[in-house]
Amino acid sequence: ATDLQAGYVADSNFTEAWKKVVPNVDPPKTPSAFMXP
């Protein structure tokens, strides 16, 4: 459960950052795929 929660928080932060950088483009639905270690 903690992994899902952490992933959700990371996705949320990614979406917020994306909106600030690229406000005219919708963020990817699976940002975790681009943030894999």
UniProtKB/Swiss-Prot annotation:
Compartments, as annotated in UniProt: Mitochondrion; Mitochondrion inner membrane
GO CC list: mitochondrial inner membrane
Main location: mitochondrion
GO biological process, one term: ATP biosynthetic process
Keywords (A to Z) from UniProt: ATP synthesis, Hydrogen ion transport, Ion transport, Membrane, Mitochondrion, Mitochondrion inner membrane, Transport
Family in the record: Belongs to the ATPase delta chain family.
Function: Mitochondrial membrane ATP synthase (F(1)F(0) ATP synthase or Complex V) produces ATP from ADP in the presence of a proton gradient across the membrane which is generated by electron transport complexes of the respiratory chain. F-type ATPases consist of two structural domains, F(1) - containing the extramembraneous catalytic core and F(0) - containing the membrane proton channel, linked together by a central stalk and a peripheral stalk. During catalysis, ATP synthesis in the catalytic domain of F(1) is coupled via a rotary mechanism of the central stalk subunits to proton translocation.
Oligomeric form and interacting partners: F-type ATPases have 2 components, CF(1) - the catalytic core - and CF(0) - the membrane proton channel. CF(1) has five subunits: alpha(3), beta(3), gamma(1), delta(1), epsilon(1). CF(0) has three main subunits: a, b and c.
Name of protein: ATP synthase subunit O, mitochondrial
Organism annotation: Solanum tuberosum
Organism placement in taxonomy: Eukaryota, Viridiplantae, Streptophyta, Embryophyta, Tracheophyta
